[in-house]
């Protein structure tokens, strides 16, 4: 895109990437996991378009699998053990999602992702789709929920069989002074933290909480000092990683339901207290 006064002129150059070039780029990056080429239709797209989109994604996946096998066989490939994950799509149409899950499950991939969620639909719609789709994905392969989400979203996803997640929330929200705690999300830009000498979270072992107060981090944010954003991001990443450790421990101990209930009650209590 090229900016011209107050309008934007769209370049006529073809910026799209085909299946093989996508695989080659990921192979050269030598990532542990490569994601198959897919199309993510809008959550409000009409049914006919979504069906055509999903059919196209299925064809692309077959090509991706063949190309990844070829790349992994080459002598100069960096990571010959690179894994390939297929991506389930279908917007908010349960039946299309389920049929697509069945189709890609037959391809015997290394893992499976659920994509196209957290793109405008409600949390309830997202959970409805997960309830419908996850049972049709191989139970002996890892399942990845793409682009999700809040701590509560993660707890709901794990309960429905999701194994891992990725999301910009910890870093993006941290850059805006929003930090996650056991009692919900805090906005350190709020004036009530101006003289608050407590750490972001009592008992937290992250560098931000060990060495800095809410008031000082707020001062850094207000002064547009990069350190303020960095400290918020550090805390959020620590919070998310620590929560995932606790989730794994709860699953191993067989008490995830109790852990989830405790966590959600803490988040809800924080919402109530923040309004007082």
Regions picked out by a protein language model, each given a short descriptive name:
Residues 21, 26, 86, 104, ...:
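Terminal peptide-recognition signature
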Residues 16-18, 22-78, 191-194:
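Non-catalytic, usually N-terminal nucleic-acid engagement modules in DNA/RNA processing proteins
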Residues 38-42, 201-276:
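C-terminal extensions of enzymes
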Residues 58, 62, 127, 131-134, ...:
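Predominant activation on well-ordered alpha-helical scaffold segments within soluble catalytic domains
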Residues 55-58, 67, 71-73, 79-200:
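Glycine-rich phosphate/ribose-binding loops and adjacent secondary-structure elements
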């Amino acid at each position: 895109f090229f900016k011209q006064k107050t309008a934007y002129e769209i370049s006529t150059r073809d910026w799209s990437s085909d299946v093989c070039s996508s695989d080659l780029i990921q192979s050269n990056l030598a990532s542990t996991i490569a994601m198959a080429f897919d199309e993510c239709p809008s959550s409000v797209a009409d049914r006919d378009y979504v069906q055509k989109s999903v059919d196209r994604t299925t064809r692309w996946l077959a090509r991706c699998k063949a190309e990844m096998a070829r790349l992994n066989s080459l002598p100069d490939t960096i990571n010959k053990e690179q894994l390939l994950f297929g991506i389930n799509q279908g917007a908010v149409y349960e039946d299309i999602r389920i049929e697509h899950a069945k189709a890609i499950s037959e391809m015997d991939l290394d893992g499976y992702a659920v994509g196209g969620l957290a793109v405008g639909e409600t949390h309830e719609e997202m959970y409805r789709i997960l309830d419908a789709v996850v049972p049709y994905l191989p139970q002996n392969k890892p399942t990845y929920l793409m682009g999700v989400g809040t701590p509560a979203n993660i707890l709901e996803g794990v309960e429905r069989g999701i194994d891992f997640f990725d999301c910009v929330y910890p870093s993006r929200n941290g850059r805006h002074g929003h930090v996650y705690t056991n009692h919900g999300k805090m906005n350190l830009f709020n004036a009530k933290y101006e003289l608050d000498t407590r750490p972001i979270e009592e008992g937290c072992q992250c560098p931000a909480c060990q060495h800095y107060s809410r008031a000082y981090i707020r001062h850094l944010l207000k002064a547009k000092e990069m350190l303020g954003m960095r400290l918020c991001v550090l805390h959020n990443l620590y919070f998310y990683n620590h929560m995932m450790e606790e989730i794994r421990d709860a699953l191993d101990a067989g008490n995830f339901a109790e852990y989830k209930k405790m966590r959600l009650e803490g988040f809800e209590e924080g919402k109530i207290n923040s309004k007082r």
